[in-house]
Amino acid sequence: SCGMGERALLDVARRLDAVAELVGDLSVLEPVDGELWPDLWAGIPGTARLVKTASIPSDAEELDGLELVRLPSHDEMLAVPRAYLDGTVRLERETHQSRRILAQPNGDRTVLLMPPAAPLTTEELDGLYALPFSRRPHPSYKEPIPAVEMIATSITTHRGCGGGCSFCSLALHQGRRIASRSEASILDEAKRIAAMPRGGSISDVGGPSANMWGAACRLDPSKCRRDSCMYPSICKGFSVDQRACIDLLRDVQATPGVKHVRVASGVRFDLALKDATALAAYTGEFTGGQLKIAPEHCVPDVLDLMRKPGMKPFEAFLEAFVRYSEAHGKEQYVIPYLMSAFPGCTDAHMRQLGDWLAA
């Protein structure tokens, strides 16, 4: 599957169950008629599958009742690097709102990518996160995993990101529409973490962008053709109550057995600047010395290609962060994520970034 996979996996399981009823009791070693499979997997949103290239007429404009969009072939991308970029742009445009099938040939085989599955509802997310996950590494891992303790005590509040940054896979996996868990579900998870050995400190609370819990579109998202809810400016239809996010964090902090709650990364700084009260709380109450955020670069031409806000809001955020940290008697630091070698970023751009860091 592609995307988060729960709906696709459920659909696959139901179809396999139907096959079992059709063919009767079989040993796992007995072959099943191969003619069943091509039709069995057709039309499942959020999946990719391989078919024979010859099975798709060269002039076909539709498949499985949906419009067919052809991407540059694998061989074309190897021969002409620009084709890889063109294919990536087409893929991204179709992933968010598409009801079309994407096809990419590779010799005698073609990958078919179905339209994305719908995001899970709040009730479905709550049911998923209520499952008894062990929060331990898979037994196949023999060596220690450095991040495992941090991950084991973190809480996902929502999926999706309105940022739509052009380099980021999160919106491709989870979509730009925010799907949020209920406060009750999040607090139940906080209780379970608090009951764990050394579970008193919750390392991170949030999602792809930490301050988008509960966000929604006030307009009609089915008609939206924007690449980003945030760029070039925050869409007037993007609605989020950041103070509700702060109230949620305070309720998590008040959970019996919880000693510390942190938002360690992912605060969208241009959005945070829209609510000074919430930003002061993120900084003073829920930052544990360091906050990781993602300006990615400092050169306007590169930031435009990335669909990132300019340096003016980032520097305004830094000033506010220092001011609110000092007001709470804390010495804290912002750790910036920065990117090199982005398509369109030149050596001269990187020298400008180096000069900015050194200043």
Model segments located where?
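Glycine-rich beta-alpha loop elements in corrinoid/cobalamin-binding modules
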Residues: 1-106
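Hydrophobic alpha-helical scaffolding
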Residues: 2, 114-118, 151-158, 172, ...
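N-terminal [4Fe-4S]-dependent radical SAM core
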Residues: 85-154
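Conserved, mostly hydrophobic/aromatic
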Residues: 128, 161, 165, 186, ...
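N-terminal pre-triad scaffold of radical SAM enzymes
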Residues: 141-169, 194, 203
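Conserved alpha-helical substructure of the radical SAM core
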Residues: 172-201, 251
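Conserved SAM/AdoMet-binding glycine-rich loop
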Residues: 192-335, 339-343
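Catalytic cores of alpha/beta
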Residues: 277-278, 342-358
